[in-house]
């Protein structure tokens, strides 16, 4: 445990976040996501919702503001405009952290993009479509407050 940090930020997750450079991507995945298949580095946070993990990650990592969307969710198959509850919760977390709303990718495009991610965090999220790709932004000298 460390002061001032979410207990969800395990040593492994902090190491990955610190090792990532500007433009690197990390996937926060639900329990149904084929995380082991797509992960070059796999971190497991069982029993924790994707929104809680997103909140913890955004407390220490800025999203990339040099791209249209620093966060991307998976579109609902057959209804690209649908907003599942897990995605609505993630959008609320993004807004709370002052981030732009997440964009979305078609399911197989999401899987393809996830395969190139720096790491995948397998959460305990049981709701469908609880997946998001985060693109790391620039950490400014003195922080991004």
Model regions and ranges:
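Long, hydrophobic N-terminal alpha-helical segment
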Residues: 1-44, 49
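Structural motif
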Residues: 24-27, 41-43, 64-66, 70-73, ...
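Fold-independent oxyanion-binding glycine-rich loops
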Residues: 5, 29-31, 36-38, 45-46, ...
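Glycine-rich, aromatic-bearing surface loops/beta-hairpins
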Residues: 80-145
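Conserved phosphate- and dinucleotide-binding cores of soluble alpha/beta proteins
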Residues: 4, 34, 64-66, 138-143
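Surface-exposed, low-hydrophobicity beta-strand/loop segments enriched in small/polar/acidic residues
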Residues: 72-76, 87-88
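Long, charge-dense
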Residues: 46-68
């Amino acid at each position: 445990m460390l002061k001032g940090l979410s207990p969800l930020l395990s040593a492994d997750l902090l190491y990955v976040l610190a090792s990532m450079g500007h433009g690197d991507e990390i996937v926060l995945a639900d329990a149904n996501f084929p995380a082991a298949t797509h992960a070059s580095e796999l971190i497991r946070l069982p029993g924790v919702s994707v929104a809680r993990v997103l909140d913890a990650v955004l407390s220490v990592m800025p999203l990339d503001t040099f791209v249209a969307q620093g966060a991307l969710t998976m579109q609902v198959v057959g209804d690209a405009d649908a907003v599942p509850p897990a995605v609505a919760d993630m959008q609320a977390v993004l807004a709370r952290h002052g981030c732009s709303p997440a964009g979305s990718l078609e399911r197989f495009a999401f899987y393809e993009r996830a395969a190139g991610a720096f790491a995948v965090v397998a959460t305990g999220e049981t709701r469908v479509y609880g997946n998001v790709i985060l693109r790391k932004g620039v950490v400014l000298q003195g922080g991004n407050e």
